[in-house]
Each structure stands twice: as C-alpha cells, then as structure tokens.
C-alpha cells in the first residue's frame, strides 16, 4: 500500500541550538524507517557516553557520522511517514552547507520546517539580526520553498507558557510576512523535541493550544508538482568510460523523461548522440524521471567531448542551449566591500562552475517587496538585493528560474565563501546570434 504515497522533501531550518536535530531525530525515531535494533544500539552507546538527554539528536548524529564516513546507510533512515506522505529530511548541518545544498542541492526542498527555541537566550540568539536563521528563511523563500511550518521548540524549558509562545509567534510571523510568506496560513506549533509534546500526539501540557500537531501540519502540505511534462534537462555530474560499454554520462534528471533511443544534445557543445540505455543503481530503467540519479550510455562520443556542467536534452523537444548573457535577481549575503560593474566571481549553477562578469548592476530592489529603489547604482553591498546583467566567461547552460528552477538558481562564490545567491530572470541565447529566450536580456 505504501507505494502510492507521494514523496515530499523537507528541509529543516534552525539555529544550531534550536533543537532541530532532537526534533527531527524524535520524529524519525517514532515514525521512520529506523529498525528497533539500531535504535537500541544507539541508546546503549548514548547512555554509556552519558548523553542520555541527547538521545534523539544522537540518532541523527550517528546517521550523519556513518554517512560522512561513506558508509552507505539505508536512505529510509532519513524518511518518516505521515498518513498522506513519505517525507525525506534534507538536513543541512552548517551554514555554508545550507546555502550550498539549497542552491546545488541534492534535491529541491518542497516544504520547510523552521525550528525556533522558546528559551530566552536561545530565541534571541537564533532570531537576532545577525542570526543565520533569518537568512535561511529568506533563502528558502527566494529559492522557491513556499510552504513552511514553524515549531516553537523547547516549550518544556519555559514551563509550557502560552505568553512566551504568543510572543515568539508574533515576532516570527512578522518576519515571515516581510519575507513574503502567507503568514496567516502558517502553523505555529508549541513543541518539545525532547519530550515529544505536540510532535505526533496532542500534549496535555499545552491545553491552551487548539491547533494541529507537527505531523498533522506537515500532512496538510500540498504535494509538489514534479516536472515530468517539461522538456528534458540533465546537468552532468561526470562522464565515465566503462569497459565493454563505452561512454557513460552521469547526472540527475531535473525535468522531463529520458528513454533509450532518444537523440540527445549536450549543450553548450554541439555534440549529439543517441541514448543506448539508462541505468540507476545498476538496474536498467525503461525511463528515468525527475529526481532519478542515473548513468546512461551514448553512442560514438568520446569522454573528452562532454564534461561535468554540460546539460543533456532531447534534440526534438526544446533542447538546451548555451547562453551569452543573462539577467538575474541577486541577494548579496556576505561581501567585505562593494560590488561594482566588472566584478568577476565564480558562479555555481547546477553542476557547472564558471566565472561570470557583472556587466551591469541594473537596479537595486527592495528584498521584501521586489520594487526598484535605485536605477543603475554604482555599487551594491552585503544585504542588498539587485537586478544584474551577467556574462559567463565560458559557454554555459542556464535557464530561467520560472521555467527550470534547478537550472535557474545559482550561488556566487569568491574568497572561498558564498558571496550571493540569485535566480535567473531572462536569457540571451548563444544560438547563431538569435535571442530565443522568452524575453531578451536587458542591454
């Protein structure tokens, strides 16, 4: 029966001390695919190390440690089930990882769970101006995660106070509104990740709370629309030569469907080749769909002709093309000085890493409302949002964010850190000089 349930990717946002690991661990522990034996083993180790109070977070820590050591653990460990859905937790431990995962993410999050701590120091730290939590919420919204649930955590540390809950709810709700969420429709749930209050069952310690439990709230989310019906796009993660088979590009299907027999183009190059077979986890697939990480065999193409960052598409259905310029909305997160025209940092978009030049800063815009506040500003700095015209220094395949989200969002990197994030609005194609995008890039 379980097969018919829709899969939803859940990104958990929260300050390191918000208790998000304990909350997530507790849910996975109660509803997930962790077998009893594993849990008992973890509990025993946890007790021996005197970490009894971190039991649920410990579950997650162990999974992370095993994952980081390269032990392939059953992905079911990161899943939990509600009456309507299978949820997969996309956990992003650190700030840098969070930004990286949100942009080039192994999977696009459909829903965000924001965990904020109710304890006095905790909330102020997590939700201060400098707190990364706010930035992560803004990033999630900018990158298309429009559904969010808020867990007001550690209620056990404030004696399950309704006043404290209301105070936090007001502040977080105001911020969500500013960012652009429909805050009146967002569930704010008083929880204790450790004690389990209002996670799965209603707690008798919060008789004043009449709303849903965390799981009930997650179960009311709208299922994601998977882009099966869009033209095919597969950003290549690598290209391998396999004895007896030949050239095998590897990547994740972002949109569309791939079947053997299709004639593929590898943009931005002019290489065209027929797909002979498609495999996932060593099994031959009749068709690969969005979200599938696959390898596929192509005829008469050498490993030297195609590479990571190229995008495979169907020659007969709106094939991908290289792009000579594009305009994008960027949010500057972290730059020590000012960014002016001519700045040329590295751009990470899907699997490609290419230097791009800021041709022109077209306008500075209000992050919240999207309205233009200044035309052609001389410079932009941390905290600013702007519309900019960019030029890749090498041929590059990108798409508009509205048409192909995974190929239309990017991170700008410089000085070994993420300087900005952006989404692409308009393209100028490299196609015999013709502009085939929906709207030409601003000059």
Curated annotation (Swiss-Prot):
List locations, semicolon-separated. Answer: Cytoplasm
Q: Can you tell me which residues bind GTP? A: 14-21, 91-95, 153-156
Protein name, please? Elongation factor 1-alpha
The job of this chain, per UniProt, is described as: This protein promotes the GTP-dependent binding of aminoacyl-tRNA to the A-site of ribosomes during protein biosynthesis.
Region annotated G4, chain positions: 153-156
Keyword list (alphabetical) reads: Cytoplasm, Elongation factor, GTP-binding, Nucleotide-binding, Protein biosynthesis
Can you name a GO cellular component term? cytoplasm
Chain spans, region G3 = 91-94
Spell out the residue ranges making up region: G5. 192-194
Span of domain tr-type G:
5-228
Q: What ranges does the record give for the region G2, renumbered to this chain?
A: 70-74
Q: Name one GO molecular function term.
A: GTPase activity
Q: Which domain of life is it from?
A: Eukaryota
Question: Per the annotation, which location comes first and is thus the protein's main one?
Answer: cytoplasm
Family as reported in the entry's similarity comment: Belongs to the TRAFAC class translation factor GTPase superfamily. Classic translation factor GTPase family. EF-Tu/EF-1A subfamily.
Which InterPro entries does this UniProt record tie to the protein? EFTu-like_2, G_TR_CS, GTP-eEF1A_C, P-loop_NTPase, T_Tr_GTP-bd_dom, TRAFAC_GTPase_members, Transl_B-barrel_sf, Transl_elong_EF1A/Init_IF2_C
Pfam family of the protein (one): GTP_EFTU
Q: Where is this region: G1?
A: 14-21
